[in-house]
């Protein structure tokens, strides 16, 4: 039987913070964690962590283009969230 390695505590906390109460948003945020976060530059990781402190309606507005940001790292995170893995 294969044993799973214990999860990195920081990654576990980030995954937990990706749980928003909207399945679609959960899937997008968790997809970013699984596919992009580890390889992202520190400024992009910081932008993602900041995004997780943003209220859901504002995240949705950013994702749909109804709200724009002039933060280039946050813009890049939004772009990556909308990409298919």
What name fits each language-model region?
Residues 2-85:
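Positively charged, polar, low-complexity stretches
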């Amino acid at each position: 039987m294969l044993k799973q390695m214990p999860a990195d505590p920081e990654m576990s906390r980030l995954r937990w913070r990706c749980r928003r109460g909207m399945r679609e948003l959960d899937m997008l945020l968790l997809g970013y964690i699984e596919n992009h976060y580890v390889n992202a530059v520190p400024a992009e990781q910081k932008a993602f962590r900041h995004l997780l402190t943003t209220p859901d309606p504002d995240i949705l507005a950013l994702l749909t283009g109804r709200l724009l940001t002039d933060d280039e790292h946050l813009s890049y995170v939004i772009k990556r969230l909308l990409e298919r893995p």
